[in-house]
Amino acid sequence: MFDDLKEYLREWFKKVITSRLFVLAVVFCLMSSALVMRLFNLQIIKGEEYQDAYTAMTEKVIKTASTRGNIYDRNGNVLAYNELAYDVTIQDTGAYKTDAQWNTMLYDLVSILNKHGESAQTSLELTLDHDGNVVYTSETQSGRKRFLCDYYGLKNVDEMDDSDGKYPSDISAPDLLERMKKEYHLTLGDDKNRDGRPLDKDGNPIDVSDEVALQIVGIRYTMRFTAFQKYESTTIATDISDETVADILEHAADLVGVNIQESTIRVYNESIYFAPIIGYTGKVTSERLEELKTVNDDYELNDVVGRTGIESSMELELKGKKGSQTAYVDNVGRILSVTGEVAPVAGNDIWLTLDLNLQKGIYHILEKQLAGVLLKTIVNQDEKDIAYIDSSSIKIPIKKAYFQLINNNVLSIDNFASEEASDVEQQIYQKYESSRVRIEQELRGELQSENATPMNALSEEMQAYMQYIYSYLSSSNKAIVQRDAIDTSSDMYQAWKNGTISLREYLYYGIANNWIDTTKLDIQSRYSNADDVFTALLDDCFRDLEQDPAFEKLIYQYLINNNVVTGRELCMALYSQNVLAYDENEVNLLRVSGEEYAYQFLMNKIRNIEITPAQLALDPCTASCVVTSAKTGEVLALVSYPSYDNNRISDSTYFAQLNADQSLPLRNNATQTLKAPGSTFKPITAIAGLEEGAITLSDMINCTGIYEEVSNPIRCWKYPGFHGPLNVVGGIENSCNYFFSEVAHRLSTETDGSYKPEKGLETLKKYATMFGLDRTSGIEISEATPSISDTDPERSSMGQGTHQFASVQLARYVTALANRGTVYDLSLIDKETDSQGNLVKDYSPAVASTLDFQTSTWDAVQQGMRQVVTNSSTKRVFDGLDVHVAGKTGTAQESQKRGNHAFFISFAPYENPEISVTVSIPNGYSSSNAAMVAKHVYRYFYGYASLDDILNSGALDASNERINGD
């Protein structure tokens, strides 16, 4: 039996060996053995060695930020400094693999920030405006293209607008946001398997609002710039509150890669007085980064830099020098150890020539003067009952002031509809809501009627609504009406412009002529007719208008005009929304009183500066004043009203409010607002006439009231009266239009008696250029470029024509008048010191040129300017002022429907000028208002009034009567 078993095994073994599978089995066993041995060697014998080699692979140099230099006024008062703060940073640790994971984490992070009134700050140049529309934040067209170029991942802007249409340079802001939402799968696209929407705790997808989406895509976009440097964290929120810090740390397990980091933030003292000058800091834009890297390669996309003002122009001096850390990082960018460190060098300090208290006092003088003008101008009448005389006597109906409380967002219409709304707010909203439904029904009925009423036959209110609908459909955001495709020479277009056809008829014409973009309408059928398109257009339009704040405001305008919403209700709402500090007595009086009391109430609030000219944004609501040292050219004050708080500029909600504010607080009115100078230009004409020999000191020009030596006769302001014979001093004192027209005419006359206007224009330009009016003033912040008139020498001689100058440019000119010929390149900067106080650079104003005119010329011009103050109608403004002032008033009309612009240039003391004061009030009605500001500036500067006197006073007296000769 044993032998049988043995024989059986022998036969079996023989079969196995001779089998073709035997060789394969042997090979498999050998390979398995080799693999096991290799794994044993890798994991057991050399595992630690390989792990070390894997994790400690790269040495990197990580830059550390320097401390930004401080900014001081001329007396050492700190205006800008740094303060310890906490930032939120984010780093890609590799924990999140899918879009859904990333978006969920970022949604949670953004929700925490928003809950505490904060938001993500990113390099994305998109935001929501005050009405909730997505808009670009790029400051220039080239900046927007540079941003888009970076987003597309292109090297230069020339690569955009490719034939495939992948990289359009004209993509709208809303379309760009939609594109980015699809890119990061924040919205459900065509690929249902790539749903990257954030998930709630139950795993359900969340549809995010545009506000949240902008922050999420902004973070992801910004992180792209450190995608290959994962050891670099990205700062996405700065100066967060302690509550936000605690909330983020509490949810740290769900926010992998999110950290709290100590940093510094920029803090501005007395911000409202200096914001237009100092500016603000923020994350560097792509365009600015490109510019900075040409002079300092240390700049990176996450850097905070000066965005405007002195912060921007002195960026390189304030920034300092970055430090560095040398560190080992692993393959996913985690820092393993720091092996070396170079400390950063603090930036230098900048000292301004400006005086804090002078700046502050003038700001409030301007505000109170504007309030005084409004008190003279606002009347308790309806617009239809106000008689128009001329642009110096325009009145503002009180209902327009009431509407501005809504129109300029002093009152929030969203609050009217909120659950927390007061009784009066609910009443206002109920009136609005019932009216809105009625108005929509009337509009639909009119637009759907085959016998629609022509525009000019509609009521004023219905015309306004129809015009708004058309403007909305043709706006850049909506662009259903393609304006570029409209044939403006067609009869239908002309009929529309003339109001002889209805909006319905015009839109049907647009459908037939293919300038209605049907791709943007929800049309189900591929073979739709004109009626289908028009119905879809109306449905789309009215659906949008229900959520459109601007249309809502238009309805409120007519509710106020028609006495449906009353001034009394709106004044009470000022207390409900905490615009005014609660006063129970006033609220009760408003509740039981009528509209006359509401009018007096609002006027008192304007008088007491509880409601400011900037809030109402009525004419006038802006002004500027520049004070210079006549002896040194230093700018002692450069004030723009209104202003803003640059400490809050990183708050996107606040920034949107500033951009929506109709008083334009972000504009520096002293440097950016260009206006014709009016009669303030006449001293230049006088100098040109004397120095060129067109007139002499003894020449008498006989004013007859109307100058008829030109084809378009020029009336003197005294017409039908006349001045009679005047010399140059009298011409300036009386600001005689006839006199200066004759001077310009003589400057335009050749020796042979022929009249050549270009000769006169060239001569006026020559002397204006001597005073620096052909170029910017030299100050270290952004400034609009001036222009000297190139048409009509006679009118140009009086400051009309095409002259355009900013206040700071007129200030340089009058400074040279005051010091008799030293033209300075003005400067806002006194000096630069290092962090230890050592002088680095002196910025004393440079002398641009010295004007070598005859002493008698200076005497005559200065005497004429002195007599403007002592003998002309301006005398009543300066009565009682112990300082001897010389000056020249000026007004300029830009529109017959708005008040004249008001100017006053001056210097004092007349006998030995120390300072010059230049005042500009756009739409300020009369130059007496500008002169009144100057008077109060001199009183304050020379100690006849204190800062407390200014701060504790109410609105200043104003006069809308025109000064003779302006």
Which residue ranges define each predicted feature?
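A short, polar/charged loop-to-alpha-helix boundary motif
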Residues: V88-Q101, S643-S663
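Active-site beta-strand/loop architecture of penicillin-binding DD-peptidases
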Residues: G69-R74, S263, N269, A275, ...
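Conserved catalytic neighborhood of penicillin-recognizing serine enzymes
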Residues: N348-D349, K395-E440, R444, Q448, ...
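Mid-domain, small-residue-enriched loop/turn segments at the edges of structured enzyme/sensor domains
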Residues: T622, P713-H723, Y755-E794
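Second-shell loop/turn segments in exported
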Residues: M57-K60, T89-T98, K230-T238, S263, ...
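Active-site SXXK
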Residues: R38, G76, L106-L109, I248, ...
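Membrane-proximal periplasmic segments of bacterial cell-envelope enzymes
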Residues: M1-K605, L616-S624, A630, A744, ...
